[in-house]
């Protein structure tokens, strides 16, 4: 049976201690034979609303901490890059390079990521027609010398795309479940359930969010039939230094993932 991809971890590396506490709580996912697990956290949040917002420890220290998670827990790592010159050093630690939604059309960044051996998760911009994500996927595949396109070509060459909501007026996002079907024509699809409930800029200098909608939207995405899920999680989301309002605590995450596995099994049985 095909494994469900699960990407989870704190939004940003706040400290090594916090990262290890979260990784310890997530290790059961890494050991689950039905899950392809990636630990996620960012070394730099380069697009925070305010210049005064916490960004993270930076590239060098952040990669050391992510490598220590890999060594201690045997987890594969996903983290995002914002500049082309980050692709090579980050790929020495990360198994997956994530292209942020705001940067999903940046050719130089996509090409630099494609030149590494890492898998690539391209987050669809909040502004982007879901069918246009195919051009970002093609930039990666063609850089890697792949002329084929479509779901199977992307899957073979380690390219995912992620849905994280679409702009709906100012300070709000909505999820159009049709986009999951459309995007899956071009690559395996990940549903970013926590960023999809974000309310950009709604907290006065930072983004707000409505985490009570995370589980319902994730269940709906599972029913559509996709390849995996992305969740940001924290020991105490209320105290998180980034994106706390849309995160799940660890108990809610575990319950949600169990439900998603059940839904995916039903979908597979009825295909």
From Swiss-Prot:
Primary localization: cytoplasm
One CC-aspect GO term: cytoplasm
Alphabetically ordered keywords of this record: Cytoplasm, Lipopolysaccharide biosynthesis, Transferase
Enzyme class, spelled out: transferase
PANTHER family: PHOSPHO-2-DEHYDRO-3-DEOXYHEPTONATE ALDOLASE
Family: Belongs to the KdsA family.
Protein name, as recorded: 2-dehydro-3-deoxyphosphooctonate aldolase
Gene responsible for this protein: kdsA
């Amino acid at each position: 049976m095909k494994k469900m991809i699960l990407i989870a971890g704190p939004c940003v590396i706040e400290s090594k201690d916090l990262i290890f506490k979260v990784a310890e709580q997530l290790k059961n996912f890494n050991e689950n034979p039905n899950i392809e697990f990636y630990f996620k956290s960012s070394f730099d949040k380069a697009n925070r609303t305010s210049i005064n917002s916490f960004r993270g420890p930076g590239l060098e220290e952040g990669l050391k901490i992510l490598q220590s998670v890999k060594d201690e827990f045997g987890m594969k790592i996903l983290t995002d890059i914002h500049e082309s010159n980050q692709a090579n050093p980050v790929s020495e630690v990360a198994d997956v390079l994530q292209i942020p939604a705001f940067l999903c059309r940046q050719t130089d960044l996509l090409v630099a990521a494609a030149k590494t051996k890492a898998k690539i998760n391209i987050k669809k911009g909040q502004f982007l027609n879901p069918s246009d994500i195919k051009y970002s996927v093609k930039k990666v595949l063609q850089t890697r010398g792949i002329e084929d396109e479509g779901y199977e070509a992307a899957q073979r060459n380690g390219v995912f795309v992620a849905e994280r909501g679409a702009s709906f007026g100012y300070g709000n996002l909505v999820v159009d479940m049709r986009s999951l079907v459309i995007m899956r024509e071009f690559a395996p699809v990940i549903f970013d359930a926590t960023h999809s409930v974000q309310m950009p800029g709604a907290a006065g200098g930072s983004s707000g969010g409505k985490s009570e909608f995370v589980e319902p939207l994730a269940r709906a995405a599972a029913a559509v039939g996709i390849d995996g899920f992305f969740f940001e999680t924290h020991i105490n989301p209320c105290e998180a230094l980034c994106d706390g309002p849309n995160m799940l605590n660890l108990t809610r995450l575990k319950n949600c993932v169990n439900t998603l596995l059940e839904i995916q099994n039903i979908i597979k049985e009825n295909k």
